[in-house]
Amino acid sequence: MNRFRVSKFRHTEARPPRREAWLSDIRAGTAPSCRNHIKSSCSLITFNSDRPGVLGIVPLQGQGEDKRRVAHLGCHSDLVTDLDFSPFDDFLLATGSADRTVKLWRLPGPGQALPSAPGVVLGPEDLPVEVLQFHPTSDGILVSAAGTTVKVWDAAKQQPLTELEAHGDLVQSAVWSRDGALVGTACKDKQLRIFDPRTKPQASQSTQAHENSRDSRLAWTGTWEHFVSTGFNQMREHEVKLWDTRFFSSALASLTLDTSLGCLMPLLDPDSGLLVLAGKGKRQLYCYEVVPQQPALSPVTQCVLESVLRGAALVPRQALAVMSCEVLRVLQLSDTAIVPIGYHVPRKAVEFHEDLFPDTAGCVPATDPHSWWAGDNQQAQKVSLNPACRPHPSFTSCLVPPTEPLPDTAQPAVTETPVGDADASEGFSSPPSSLTSPSTPSSLGPTLSSTSGIGTGPSLRSLQSLLGPSSKFRHAQGTVLHRDSHITNLKGLNLTTPGESDGFCANKLRVAVPLLSSGGQVAVLELRKPGRLPDTALPTLQNGAAVTDLAWDPFDPHRLAVAGEDARIRLWRVPAEGLEEVLTVPETVLTGHMEKICSLRFHPLAADVLASSSYDLTVRIWDLQAGVDRLKLQGHQDQIFSLAWSPDGQQLATVCKDGRVRVYRPRSGPEPLQEGPGPKGGRGARIVWVCDGRCLLVSGFDSQSERQLLLYEAEALAGGPLAVLGLDVAPSTLVPSYEPRHWPGAPDWQGDARVFLYELLPESPFFMECNSFTSPDPHKGFVLLPKTECDVREVELMRCLRCASPPWSLWPSGCPESGKSSFQDDVFPDTAVSWEPVLSAEAWLQGANGQPWLLSLQPPDMSPVSQAPREAPARRAPSSAQYLEEKSDQQKKEELLNAMVAKLGNREDPLPQDSFEGVDEDEWD
């Protein structure tokens, strides 16, 4: 009679919530990995953010009317490929990454901050870690797959218990059976394998699963005998099969869905037997009941989604709203939201239905790793989901001990924007969350002691740990100056300068722009003479060869260095009144490079010192007074993308097409002082010193052509970047324009129109996003003007020039009312006098060092806001409601009557009719 069995889930319906119940305004990543990208415990949700190596963390349940906030945890230096919560500890998270390591994290409980470092690190492996999963019965055991290798780890000892036999190709899935005795794997060689890792490393069984080698996944049912696999057939159709390990030669049942290229993720609840099939890039969920006894995959219901699915996860059964007959809850990850989709059986919602909610495995492990490896097969004790039987025993793993909570009076805040909260009845109801808005540290490297341009003493760091770090420039806005300041009608602009060049250069007096004409002509435009340029030909500098880069001397605003394809550097002197005629003879010509020149950079402190890089793979340091190269740096294996002087002028950093970042001490020797891994992409890169010379910022591309920013500790390049920030996929190179002691803007280059703004910190969270903005048209280049050009009275933070477009000025919004009357010394610290040299070329070459002078930007008639008297808070009179609440009903009644009597009173004033004038007696007739 089993074939006529009526399923108790036959009327199950999926209930997508209203948009108010979505976890909205998140930034999910679109990683190439075929994993789920989102996981949930009974307290937390974690997902892949749009930044490689960074996870978003949010409570499963909102607290009251407050908006839930997303915290960001920097886990790895590369993409997080897979993640999993411990089945026993809601706050123990394992992450695997393309950086070839597995890390275990203790996520924050009440009053705790995000971890600054992982509790356990496993690996590194030979290839990126693709799969990982915790053991279902023992705490501290997990399985991971990297390439063709599958390992079973004892996390406490940080050593593998065993390494399974190598597979024939990339392992796509590795999962534990429900009893924890077996491991099932799916491989790109189209084979399914069953392992008993405690018996032998070889597979005990294997069979061909799906005819297509595309992504294949496994999910075990509630018993060790049966599991489900998903994959593709020869027609590239999604395929689902039910297997019995006792009859492994063929599938018990199978079904075919639609044609798609996205991975089909099986979300199987072993207690109910409900299977949700979620296809990446699709807008539909399929729900089936797995019935091994028939055997069959019985359809239950389908759910149409409002947004494209990027990932999916099941919420643990202990977090379901059992009194509402919620038998399953799926979390859909889209680009900008997490949507909870509950599956409900239409029954009375005031009773607990034991047939729908059988006892499930509890959160106390049945055994330890040593006992399990010795053969112990005890199962976790089951617990009832009936609310009347709660609470259940809890467990905290000793793998990563919890930290001490902060005092109850101080709750830490989150680093990101609030996300839309969910109604308690709309699918996110769960036990109270333990995430209390942590700050955002990162484990990508050692933390430093202070920030870039903003003092972070102990008091400020303590405040940030309580309130969450946020940039004071987060409300900055980009504003186009009035058209009267524009320089327009510029014709013949050269749009084909090499990728190593910024395209144009500027100082406080003039702009130099290469033109698309023969002879390497350079136009020099006076900033003090804005307006429309004449239609006639402009006076130019005749360089004689195509321009590859150009730079103004920071200590001589009339001297311009121009590099050409003929491997020569020409120094031009522009008359003080401006360029009025064509100049054909440069002041000096520097020769020495063997091939065309890539970049030019003047020394920040010493006069007449210039660095140049060339396609001959060398960097030369020139003495402009003598007109010769005095130093030559070597060690590059490919094209040099960019170079930059350190703020103290003692070191020079380069980023190269060979994927390496190098730091030199030019006066010490020609070989690099240290090297480290750089961007993997070979399309272009930039490098700049930040955070007072303690860090290096590199912009470039990863292997997937995604543009990214990498932050390095300058003294530890070999350890890799402290943090990696992924932005978007675009062909143009990001050109970082850094404002010392403030914050950088990283504008897109050549054909882009967006400008990204970040404040940089040498410690976690490293990148603090500000208010990015988009220009109305694409720009060719982007240059910062000296700080002295800013209007500090109007709180103008930076002034920039855009090539082929009007000048730009950056203004903050949301300034205090005193911003226009007091000098904002917290926003405008003393700036370096970058237009006056500290050393001569000869002194620097002989080993002398110096520091720039500092200049206050405070106008003489303005007082600093830090010294402005603070207004005392106005006393608020108690409200009438509060006043009345303190009195009894009888007192209120008496006071009301007295007030009425006092208002009316016993007045003896004449009545209105007494003032009327009557008529004479004879008028009555």
Curated annotation (Swiss-Prot):
GO terms for biological process: actin filament polymerization; Golgi to endosome transport; protein transport. Residues 884-896 have a biased composition (Basic and acidic residues). F-actin regulator involved in anterograde Golgi to endosome transport: upon ubiquitination via 'Lys-33'-linked ubiquitin chains by the BCR(KLHL20) E3 ubiquitin ligase complex, interacts with EPS15 and localizes to the trans-Golgi network, where it promotes actin polymerization, thereby facilitating post-Golgi trafficking. May play a role in the maintenance of the Golgi apparatus morphology. This is Coronin-7. The modification Phosphoserine is found at residues 462, 465, 915. It is found in: Golgi apparatus membrane; Golgi apparatus, trans-Golgi network; Cytoplasmic vesicle; Cytoplasm, Cytosol. The keyword Transmembrane helix does not apply. Keywords: Actin-binding, Cytoplasm, Cytoplasmic vesicle, Golgi apparatus, Isopeptide bond, Membrane, Phosphoprotein, Protein transport, Repeat, Transport, Ubl conjugation, WD repeat. The membrane-associated form is phosphorylated on tyrosine residues. Ubiquitinated via 'Lys-33'-linked ubiquitin chains by the BCR(KLHL20) E3 ubiquitin ligase complex: 'Lys-33'-linked ubiquitination promotes interaction with EPS15 and facilitates actin polymerization at the trans-Golgi network, thereby facilitating post-Golgi trafficking. Deubiquitinated by ZRANB1/TRABID. The gene is CORO7.
